[in-house]
Amino acid sequence: MNIQINNPIKADIFAAIFQNMKLFSDSVNIIFDEEKMFIQAIDSGHVAILELNIPATWFDKYAQTSMTIGVNSIILFKILSTRDKCQNIEIQCNDNADRLLIKFCSDNKTIFDKTFEMPLIDLDAELMTI
């Protein structure tokens, strides 16, 4: 899986999604398929479910293999919040990998590129259907 967001406004929106999601649930499932990135989380009381579809066309680059990953939304937001406003977001994960690679890059050479590796988590919860 390899996604890229070059538009600064979209990058801010993407970070805001996880800023708000971390208040709802610590752990989220992210499912990648040919058409979309699908996010699902359930609150700690198992009362409410959050679902979000982001179409593949929303991203500047969306090269995927069908995969489901579990991430800690708090850690992911902390990483996304280190991005400078003019930096692109690139997120990669290889098949059978246990880490998510997150890169922030810019053409402006006065701003340092940043690379993070984030451990994936194994979520016991299956995909909920509504």
Predicted feature locations:
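DNA polymerase sliding clamps and clamp-related checkpoint/processivity subunits
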Residues: 1-22, 27-130
